[in-house]
A protein has these predicted regions:
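ABC-type nucleotide-binding domain
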Residues: 1-172
Length: 172
């Protein structure tokens, strides 16, 4: 599913309503005929792997950024990095998945570009492995070549999941 609209038209707000980050104040959102307010926030959160346009990468290890609270599975971890087109960069890091990002907590931490951060946010969403993947302007910080690589892999890495793609460009 693609949601395309002008900047400021409410695309991100729509997604945040679906994820129950905001409560619906007018009308209703139904999941299988049941009002979204009948579901716990935790059950809704478990449905979605989301990359918002205002994502955050934390000053912790690469592994902790991707896996969050999940158990670490090396094969799955590197497959997600591969699908997000950042595995090669991760494998060149001195401490691989244990390398800290940024220097806030570790003076040997590595600085990453905006495009690399966006790819890591995508890898994090893929690692969560939720049934619905939502990508809100997922390639905004990427150059055209990297953007094309992500789009060419998009169907393969969402596989049998529901995918919702948000963009202000119809060409995306």
């Amino acid at each position: 599913l693609a949601v395309v609209g002008r900047n400021g038209s409410g695309k991100t707000t729509f997604i945040k309503l679906m994820c129950r980050l905001y409560d619906v104040t007018d009308g209703e959102i139904l999941i299988n005929g049941t009002d979204i307010k009948e579901y716990t926030r935790e059950s809704i959160t478990g449905l979605y792997s989301v990359v918002f346009q205002d994502f955050k990468i934390f000053s912790v290890s690469l592994k902790d950024n991707i896996c969050a609270n999940s158990d670490f599975d090396s094969d799955r971890f590197y497959a997600c990095l591969e699908n997000a087109n950042i595995k090669d960069r991760a494998e060149r890091l001195a401490d691989k998945e244990n390398t800290y990002l940024y220097k806030d907590l570790d003076e040997t931490g590595v600085e990453i570009s905006g495009g690399e951060a966006q790819k890591l946010a995508l890898a994090r969403a893929l690692y969560k492995d939720a049934p619905v993947v939502i990508l809100d302007e997922p390639t905004a910080a990427l150059d055209p070549i990297a953007e094309n690589e992500i789009y060419s892999r998009f169907n393969s890495f969402v596989q049998n999941k529901t995918a919702i793609y948000i963009s202000h460009r119809l060409s995306s």
